[in-house]
Amino acid sequence: SLVGSEMCIRDSTMGGAGGGLVYNKEELKTVCARGLQASLVGQVLVEESILGWEELELEVVRDAKGNMITVCFIENIDPVGVHTGDSFCSAPMLTISEEVQKKLQDQAYRIVDAIEVIGGTNVQFAHDPISGRVVVIEINPRTSRSSALASKATGFPIALVSAMLASGLTLDEIPCGKYGTLDKYVPDGDYIVLKFARWAFEKFKGVEDKLGTQMRAVGEVMSIGKTYKEAFQKAIRSLEKSRYGLGHVKDFDQKSKKELLTMLATPSSERYFIMYEALRKGASVEEINKLTKVKDYFIEQMKELVEEEEKLVAAYHGQVPADADLKQAKLDGFSDKYLSQILGVSEEAIRTRRTELGVVEGWEGVHVSGTEDSAYYYSSYHIKDESPVDNSKQKVMILGGGPNRIGQGIEFDYCCVH
């Protein structure tokens, strides 16, 4: 009965390998055969397509008594149709109403209670913003990629707490800082966390740079900032691809608006860099939303960055920006190196001037739940540095692998544990 309409083929594999979207009988036969071959249980699911809906996730922890808490609400900025492992994500949810979040939480609790999980579970939903309909995409009753993101975003040690719950403790028996015990925990950080995937298409000759229901990312980065713009630009710099901002990537700035919009019609690893140049060439928020189904809020934030960049280049090419404009650029996440590149002045001149103005990053702690005096820190130009440094003790530096090129993502990354 679904033949003739868009369908989604899903199999029992990690990262959606073997599945895909199909649009006719021939594609249905091909993808089903591929999915059956890849599936660990010799089955595939044939489901209606919910392409373009909002993809939303909750990380829920449950104990043996049936007590439940939500550790984190995660909004996928890319719509359904792009695998969540490839999708750009934010925590907390930035455009979803409290009413919808409460609805998702109620449904997630019913699901987790029904399967009687003890520990952490990731529940993924699709939400149609037009009709309000909600469907469950999948659940992961284990420590997943999203669990790792939720843990780092909130300071809540999901794996540790899951182990404690599995040993027989309950949430109301585990101490948790200002909340007293874990059963009273609510996510309440005053910062924004973004996850951006890292791909390596350049290492696989002949592989098309196209994103869909099969995961293509080989790693990811996570950034923390006080605003979306600040966190967004920090994420781009963390990719270790010698990109210090969103503009002037590859030859996208040489292409016409029409060419860029044609490229945006198919999701790719360069989607947000193409979007940035399309906005520079005059594409409207509505045009880009129609092609990508990325919500207006996120496109508008990017448009404001484009306008700010164009204003800086027009007014200050060959010189350091005026004090107020330089400060605003730093608040919005522009790096010294990127400002140096677009303005044609030395990076040192920009850094010297902003330091003279007192425009320097402050450091703030994300406190780890359930432990005393334990935190990790993020930098922001929106805060004053009030984190004291104790130089009386020896220190240890742990180096992680960065955004992994080939190999494990954060979900399977064991190298930082020991």
Predicted features, each with a name:
Residues 329-332, 338, 342:
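Extended, domain-scale alpha-helical bundle/helix-rich regions
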Residues 1, 234, 352-355, 361-418:
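ATP-binding N-terminal substructure of ATP-dependent carboxylate-amine bond-forming enzymes
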Residues 1, 5, 15-17, 22-314, ...:
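ATP-dependent carboxylate activation and anion-phosphoryl transfer catalytic cores
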Residues 291-300, 341-352:
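Short, basic interhelical loop/turn and adjoining N-cap
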Residues 12-13, 142, 403-404:
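Short glycine-rich anion-binding loops that position phosphate/pyrophosphate groups of nucleotides
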